[in-house]
Amino acid sequence: MKAPKFLFIAVIIVGLSGSLTWASPLPKAKAVADAMAAAEALAEAEPEALAPIFALLLLSGLFSLPALQHYIEKNYINGK
């Protein structure tokens, strides 16, 4: 069976256009730019994210003071 000439031409054109699109540097550059933007956003947001953590640690320490005071009064000041 003899294949038509236009079929070979169509296969070659589709193959080349697909490989040229796949090998294009533009999608890679966009992916790298997106990754860099995400890394910069994380670097800028990190100090802001630490403030609530320190606030929670401080509050947990302050809320434990009444329990500590009760323990000291019960065991050391008033005796067991």
UniProtKB/Swiss-Prot annotation:
Localization (cell): Secreted
Prosequence residues removed at maturation: 24-49
One of the record's GO cellular component terms: extracellular region
Residues in coiled coil: none
Highest taxon of the lineage: Eukaryota
Keyword Kinase belongs to the record: no
Tissue: Expressed by the venom gland.
Signal sequence extent: 1-23
Protein keywords: Amidation, Ion channel impairing toxin, Neurotoxin, Secreted, Signal, Toxin, Voltage-gated sodium channel impairing toxin
Asparagine amide sites (modified residues): 78
Gene Ontology MF: a single term: toxin activity
Family: Belongs to the formicidae venom clade 1 family.
Function: Vertebrate selective toxin that causes pain by targeting tetrodotoxin (TTX)-sensitive sodium channels in peripheral sensory neurons. Is able to inactivate rapid activation and inactivation currents of Nav1.7/SCN9A (on mouse channel EC(50)=18 nM, on human channel EC(50)=30 nM). The leak current is via the central pore of the Nav channel. Induces a strong hyperpolarising shift in the voltage-dependence of hNav1.7/SCN9A activation, while voltage-dependence of steady-state fast inactivation is unaffected.
Protein's recorded name: Delta-myrmicitoxin-Ta3a
Organism the protein comes from: Tetramorium africanum
